[in-house]
Amino acid sequence: SKDLAALVERFKEAGMPISYEHLGEPLPNDANLQLTIYRIAQEALTNVLRYAPTTKRITVRLARRVGCAELWVINAAAPGSPSMHKGLIGMRERAAVYSGSVQAGPVDGNWQVYAILRWQEDTLEELKWQLPV
């Protein structure tokens, strides 16, 4: 989403080594869904800034799939940085509104926040981008 890209750009302008990748089609035209994803990413990035300010790399990845969106915020774990569980409850509450979940923890030497949010996609119009040509 363009709001998420703008959020990443603001962190980049603040000097953070951050990149953004959007996979798949744009998100549904649902302002609440888009805001939920934005807020989860914002909280995860704020935690990186607070607890791992010396990280060498941050990746924000958003993937649109049929009936769901997946969000990853991954940072190279800074040596000795404390666990970043602050704000996790709020992120989980936001995701739960969309039958989703949030997980956070170390993955392959990095710290990863992963969120999945779900919605019903059952009309031909909503699914046409997934149908073979």
Model-based region annotation:
Residues Y20-A41:
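Conserved short strand/loop->alpha-helix "switch" segment adjacent to the catalytic nucleotide/phosphoryl-transfer site
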Residues R94-V133:
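Flexible, glycine-/charge-rich segments associated with ATP-binding catalytic modules
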